[in-house]
């Protein structure tokens, strides 16, 4: 992060796929071995990527625009990513499964949250 700040980059993409299968409970160890290495995406990577966005935001003291990526499947998760320090979010797996309606639903949710009374 320090190098990124010193080098003058315009922003950072935080998150995406992972080769790690830690915490994956939907299939057996044997099946995981059969599938082999490769990038895992979607819901299983969300929490790690959310933590990564928080980490980058804190370490950069909010000086780097961050694109939060990885496992965002709803408006609620997009807002969490933005609240963690992302300037923008990127979706892919959710878009594959839900199509353009996901983008509409995320935008609608964010607009509703923006207009909600502040506590």
Regions from the PLM with identified roles:
Residues 1-2, 53, 78, 103, ...:
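Generic structural signal for well-ordered alpha-helices
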Residues 3-62:
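Glycine/Thr-rich beta-alpha phosphate-binding loop at enzyme active sites
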Residues 11-21, 71-72, 76-105:
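Glycine-rich phosphate-binding active-site loops on the catalytic face of alpha/beta enzymes
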Residues 44, 69-70:
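Residues that cap or flank secondary-structure elements
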Residues 57-61, 77, 82-86, 111, ...:
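Hydrophobic alpha-helix feature that most strongly marks membrane-spanning transmembrane helices
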């Amino acid at each position: 992060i320090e190098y990124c700040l010193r080098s003058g980059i315009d922003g950072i993409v935080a998150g995406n796929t992972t080769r790690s299968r830690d915490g994956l409970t939907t299939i057996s160890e044997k099946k995981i071995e059969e599938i082999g290495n490769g990038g895992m995406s979607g819901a299983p990577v969300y929490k790690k990527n959310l933590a990564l966005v928080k980490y980058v935001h804190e370490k950069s003291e909010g000086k780097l625009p961050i694109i939060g990526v990885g496992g965002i499947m709803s408006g609620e998760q997009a807002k969490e990513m933005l609240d963690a320090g992302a300037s923008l979010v990127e979706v892919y797996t959710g878009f594959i499964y839900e199509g353009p309606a996901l983008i509409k639903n995320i935008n609608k949710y964010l607009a509703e949250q923006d207009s909600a009374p502040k506590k």
